[in-house]
Amino acid sequence: MQHTIQSILTQDAARLTTALALDPSGARIEVQCLLQHVLKTSRAWLLAHPERCLSDSEQTHYAALLQRRLRGEPIAYMLVSQFAT
């Protein structure tokens, strides 16, 4: 099943809000950050292309990151470059 950026933002922000007791706007920003990381793009691009569907590999990568976040792992730990010093 193909998921659009818009559907992911709506559904997964609600999941984060419930699971981690985040405010809805904070949860939406976190989902945007995960999508930006997976798609290697900017927030502006995400907002301009809500109809874009994730490929299977993008969806798999995103789902893995989301599960880590739902378990409470800080988003900064997931998004930091492995080459950061």
Please state what every model-predicted region is:
Residues 23-37:
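Hydrophobic alpha-helical packing segments in soluble, helical-rich domains
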Residues 33-85:
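Conserved AdoMet
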Residues 1-27:
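Non-catalytic nucleic-acid substrate-recognition regions in nucleic-acid-modifying enzymes
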